[in-house]
Amino acid sequence: VLANVPKTVVMYLLDYLLETRGYPGIAAVLKKPAGPELAPNQSGEEELMPFKVLDACFYLFAGEKMTPEDVEIVVAEMFPDIARKTVEGYVEKFVRLFLQSIYKWVQSPLSLHIGNLDLERERALQLPVVTSSEWTR
């Protein structure tokens, strides 16, 4: 299991692999809209917010430990084409959903963390899945 990889990065990597390798399985994956764990009648960006905004909120709030107010300011500057009231709604929704789902991080399986996001001290102190020397083999 890979962890700490934003959806926008995953989609970029899949596009790159499809373009450079042409794997048919990747084309099938890209035909299906990306999305989080949602009810059957829900879809990702329509239900939440644009993934580029979601990834920014996630990085700023969880990674940089910014307050919701600061996240709102930065996201509004990052995406000037999105109305400020819409940004406020996105950030408010993100923070609420994030705090409601933090238990998923505790229950998640041991994973290879690609990014450096550290959500909680207890999980961060677990032994790493791989060590640096394993990457050189």
Language-model segments: which ranges?
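ATP/NTP-dependent adenylation/nucleotidyl-transfer catalytic domains that generate, transfer
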Residues: 1-137
